[in-house]
């Protein structure tokens, strides 16, 4: 990305607060007032660096210690001192939060071990298990969790456990909330930030960001944010499309929000957000590729962070959001309305030459046909309207409540094409004249697979929650009634496709998700809570198998489930938690047990290059999570967060061969989830002179072992038989791999000098010991055509300079 793409806008809010410590909590307030309280509270007072973090996890403002369930908030200062630039980086510091990296812009989020396996780009019907919000706007989208820039965020909240009562479907495991800094009346302030970094044995990264807050008279203010970041690549590609650092990328965007308060009671906040994220390649470290491997002539053994390409790859996500939040304070109650529109245009362009070439070998094509470059292009176009309106109490009495309605309309169109120039000529020459035209089903030439899947999803919901405090006890109860309808068409064609057309497939569901919480507060420093809550995820319909690609055994095993519906996933979460905060110490912990019914597990259908969803009748997660922070000495802050989760299937598929293939066996682990995860951070701050202070920060992060898909834990280590006699490879060539993703440890260091005039200079090293973590396993055609792992970023050394100014 060229430097001219970077936008600069002026100036800064003060850094946000350090981890939460006890003080007298604010009275709860409703809705938009709540966020104003939170924004103002999450600023460091002039005389004290430690203050309570205020969150709006219950759609009311309260301290983390007063929220009656498990919640974490990473503040702006936490994000800055961790040098984090993605949700994945944040997740390693949050107990119970896991982000599986499946390539740029393609992340799966799970909370507390509620995970159903790897969702891939061609499963648009699979719903997310964690809801994601930008302030009040729903932005969740299954695999494509938006990789939003973290600049000028007030905080990132992680709400653990099902949140369907207040946040709806998609929050079956939990909810992530990106909370932005809001416009401030009567204040001119801002910040500029510049960064440069170098990736070990990789490319240079750099970025420029800015924010400005300015008054528009006495009753309005505007806040504008702009940012541009270039991410240095670190994967080297061999082959005709090879090059150094092919997975570099960029993220450019901004947002503008306006606050208008014509009267003290009325607040109107329109906002527009735009972001374009791109990657010029994927972070895939290959072990075997049809075109280059230890058996080809000449042989090739891949080194660390290498891959082989016939075509360059690309990811692009253009996201536009327009929303309007309005509130009116009637005195005892406040009315809030949130209207939002989201438009996303996503492209995943992969080098699928190994996939297409492996099929061509099976079909007996000559080498020239096998060597054709083949580009799998998956596009997703999303238009989503949502409307929420709610009423909430605003007083300080013992009874507090919120009640509202929600509606959403989603149009999602998924296209898949496999352009392979010259392919039809080899098809007709090998399989008979006219074959390519006969299987096209109306699609264009030289594309052996094509599919169109338009979806329309409508949701209506009513929700409410109330709490009553009497003496040391508080009882909270609420629920959400929902009604979903999903309509889907499926049209495909080409040599690899079954050539089927389904119009108007419909999935419907309605129900009620309750939550009950009891809280005991024997004193102002301690609270104990117990909870029972239900979560829900909408079902759907499986796609048909790509029969041409299937082996006879795979077709017999998986065809009974193809083009069949799968049921809604539901769960009940039971937990008990404790929150303690006194003086320099804060300790929060929870134990939980989740019973899952009809878990929607995603599996690979062998060599068919198809994915199916299976309902597993019973599964569970049981675990404990804890977060501890302390301020034992002046200037020294310590924090420790960790979780242990035992997540397992409690059912076995009746067919023993299918059970082994899929890994859906009683006692097997749920995929993508580490049993143990922890993070420890230490920060020491001291005055440098009468005009500045310096600090050093060190963090250690441990992520335990995981499996990408449930079937990976069967017959592991596993031998993949390629059976592709091409380019010198024998028919019996095989590769043996351990599919258990090993645990990994990261150490990050930073040191900064912060001046009283708003200037800050930070030097940092992320991944100090240059760990090469395996984040997920990548396979093509059940491992026959390609094998590899998505890996993490190498050691990165950088410098960030910030300048804050204004404030009056």
Tell what function each PLM region has.
Residues 1-82, 88-93, 213, 264, ...:
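N-terminal Sec signal peptide and the immediately downstream disordered periplasmic leader
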Residues 87, 108-110, 133, 158, ...:
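N-terminal periplasmic accessory domains that precede
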Residues 122-125, 129-162, 210:
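Short acidic/polar hinge/loop motifs at secondary-structure boundaries
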Residues 259-263, 391-394, 406-408, 453-594:
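Structural signature of Gram-negative outer-membrane beta-barrels, strongest in the C-terminal barrel
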Residues 701-721, 752-808:
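C-terminal beta-signal and adjacent terminal beta-strands/loops
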């Amino acid at each position: 990305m060229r430097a001219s793409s970077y936008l600069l806008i002026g100036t800064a809010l003060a850094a946000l607060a350090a981890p939460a410590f006890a003080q007298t909590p604010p009275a709860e307030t409703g809705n938009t007032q709540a966020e104003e309280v939170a924004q103002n509270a999450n600023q460091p007072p002039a005389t004290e660096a430690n203050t309570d973090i205020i969150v709006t996890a219950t759609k009311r403002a309260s301290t983390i210690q007063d929220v009656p369930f498990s919640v974490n908030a990473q503040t702006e200062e936490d994000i800055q001192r961790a040098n984090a630039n993605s949700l994945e980086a944040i997740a390693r510091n949050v107990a119970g939060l896991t982000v599986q990296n499946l390539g740029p812009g393609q992340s799966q989020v799970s909370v507390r071990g509620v995970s159903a396996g790897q969702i891939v780009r061609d499963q648009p019907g699979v719903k997310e298990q964690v809801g994601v919000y930008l302030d009040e706007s729903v932005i969740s989208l299954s695999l494509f969790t938006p990789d939003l820039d973290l600049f000028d965020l007030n905080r990132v909240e992680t709400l653990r456990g099902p949140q369907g009562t207040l946040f709806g479907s998609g929050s079956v495991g939990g909810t992530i909330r990106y909370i932005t800094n809001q416009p401030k009346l009567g204040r001119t302030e801002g910040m500029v930030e510049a960064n440069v970094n170098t990736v070990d044995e990789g490319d240079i990264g750099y970025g420029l960001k800015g924010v400005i807050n300015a008054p528009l008279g006495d009753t309005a203010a505007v806040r504008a944010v702009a940012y541009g970041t270039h991410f240095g690549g670190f994967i080297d590609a061999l082959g005709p499309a090879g090059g150094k650092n092919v997975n570099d990328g960029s993220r450019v965007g901004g947002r503008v929000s306006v606050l208008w308060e014509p009267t003290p009671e009325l607040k109107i906040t329109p906002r527009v957000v735009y972001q374009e994220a791109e990657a010029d390649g994927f972070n895939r470290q290959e072990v075997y590729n049809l075109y280059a491997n230890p058996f080809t002539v000449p042989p090739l053994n891949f080194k660390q962070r290498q891959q082989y390409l016939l075509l360059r790859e690309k990811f692009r996500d253009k996201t536009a959001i327009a929303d309007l939040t309005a509130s009116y304070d009637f005195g005892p109650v406040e009315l809030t309305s949130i209207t939002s529109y989201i438009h996303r245009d996503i492209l995943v362009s992969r080098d699928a030459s190994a996939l297409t070439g492996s099929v061509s070998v099976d079909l007996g094509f000559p080498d020239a046909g096998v060597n054709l470059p083949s580009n799998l292009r998956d596009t997703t176009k999303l238009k989503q309207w949502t409307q929420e309106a709610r009423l909430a109490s605003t007083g300080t009495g013992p009874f507090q409540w919120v009640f509202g309605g929600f509606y959403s309309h989603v149009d999602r169109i998924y296209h898949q094409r496999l352009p392979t120039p010259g392919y039809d000529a080899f098809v007709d020459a090998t399989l008979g004249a006219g074959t390519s035209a006969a299987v096209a089903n109306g699609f264009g030439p030289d594309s052996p697979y094509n599919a169109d899947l338009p979806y329309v999803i409508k949701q209506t919901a009513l929700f409410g929650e109330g709490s009553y405090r009497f003496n040391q006890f508080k009882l909270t109860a609420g629920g959400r009634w929902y009604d979903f309808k999903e309509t889907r068409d499926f049209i495909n064609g080409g040599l690899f496709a079954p050539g089927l057309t389904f119009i108007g497939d419909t999935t419907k569901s309605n129900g009620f998700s309750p939550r009950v919480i009891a809280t005991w507060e024997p004193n102002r420093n301690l609270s104990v809570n117990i909870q029972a809550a239900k979560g829900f995820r909408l079902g759907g319909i499986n796609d048909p198998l790509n029969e041409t690609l299937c082996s006879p055994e795979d077709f017999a095993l998986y065809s009974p489930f193809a083009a069949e519906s799968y049921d809604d996933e539901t769960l009940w979460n039971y937990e008990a938690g404790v929150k303690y905060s006194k003086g320099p110490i804060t300790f929060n912990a929870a134990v939980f047990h989740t019973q899952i019914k009809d878990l929607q597990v995603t599996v690979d259908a062998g060599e068919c290059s198809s994915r199916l969803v299976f309902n597993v009748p019973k599964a569970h997660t049981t675990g404990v999570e804890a977060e501890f922070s302390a301020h034992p000495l002046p200037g020294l802050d310590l924090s420790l967060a960790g979780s242990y989760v035992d997540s397992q299937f409690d059912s076995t598929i009746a067919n023993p061969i299918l059970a082994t293939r899929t890994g859906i066996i009683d006692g097997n682990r749920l995929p993508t989830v580490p049993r143990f995860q922890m993070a420890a951070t230490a920060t020491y701050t001291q005055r440098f002179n009468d005009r500045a202070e310096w600090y050093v920060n060190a963090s250690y992060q441990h992520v335990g072992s995981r499996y990408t898909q449930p079937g990976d834990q069967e017959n592991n280590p596993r031998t993949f038989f390629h059976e592709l006699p091409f380019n010198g490879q024998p028919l019996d060539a095989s590769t043996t791999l351990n599919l258990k993703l090993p645990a990994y440890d990261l150490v990050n260091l930073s040191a900064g000098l912060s001046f009283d005039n708003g200037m800050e200079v930070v030097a940092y090293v992320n991944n100090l010991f240059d760990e090469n973590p395996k984040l997920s396993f990548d396979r093509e055609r059940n491992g026959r055509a390609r094998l590899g792992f998505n890996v993490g970023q190498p050691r990165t050394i950088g410098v960030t300079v910030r300048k804050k100014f204004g404030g009056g």
